[in-house]
Amino acid sequence: MIAQNGTLEISRSRLMHNVAHMQRRVGMNVKLCATIKADAYGHGVAYIAELLREAGVQWACVYSLEEAMELAQLPWFGILVLSPLVIAEGGELSVDEREALRGQVRVNVTDKESAIRLAKALEVAGFEVPVKVHVQVDAGLTRVGVEPWAVEELVEVIAGLKQLELEGVFAHFSHGDVPKHDTVSEQLKVLHSVADPLRKRYPRLMVHLQNSGGAWHLEDPSLDLVRIGIALYGLQPSTSDPVEGLLPIARITAPILTIHHRPAGTGVGYGHTFVTKRPSRLCSSRARGSSPSARCRYRG
């Protein structure tokens, strides 16, 4: 969504508040990993990244390597790419991909074949310093990740590839925003069942699972990192189990074009998805959206 003739205002102080608020909740020994995929949820990734640096956040995660390229040379971020990097058999890395992986980017690895192909592509590209990888475990989301029983074998493959270095193991909650759901404790146990033995071999292994809701409602000091998403921007991850004390950081302002006075029962906008319940004063502004997402948010 692009606001035409409108202004998107980002509150630095509110973002700082949300960062500090979540950090206090998870404990000062747990690292915050800011989710800044999709242009920082539309807030502007370059500006948000700079504010996060000021706030002391040292980790960020994005969806794809393409998103990571924009941030790869920022020296204060460790950047985790959540989507597995897919390389075809015999495939090579582009120049931009090479530059990103020479920066602070970490890659998600979910199977042996992908690990071997990535290592080969790095070898062909002349990498001398290993790229750090995080292994994603399918703890019950049933979407992306290696099954728990296969983690040990995958780790052995990574250990035998000099172009790769295991840095972390992680999973995603299926119901992280519903703290009392049965799957929350079950999936935490699954992750610990594979990560705890690995910590004996890799003492500095980073283990992470929680999203915004999970970080607030589930305290687990044994986890090293929490991936905070929309809570940083002051948005609620769940309406049924809200995170207390968040402050929305964004505001859109725009000039008013027209003002109408209409009686109760007046339909407004495309499809009349809003109907006045009382005599109302309505205005139209210059902030307009033309994308599909904007159509969902704006009533015409």
Mark where each language-model region is.
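Active-site-proximal beta-alpha core segment in soluble small-molecule metabolic enzymes
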Residues: I2, T7-E9, V30-H208
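Nucleotide phosphate-binding/pyrophosphate-handling subdomain across enzymes
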Residues: M16-C33
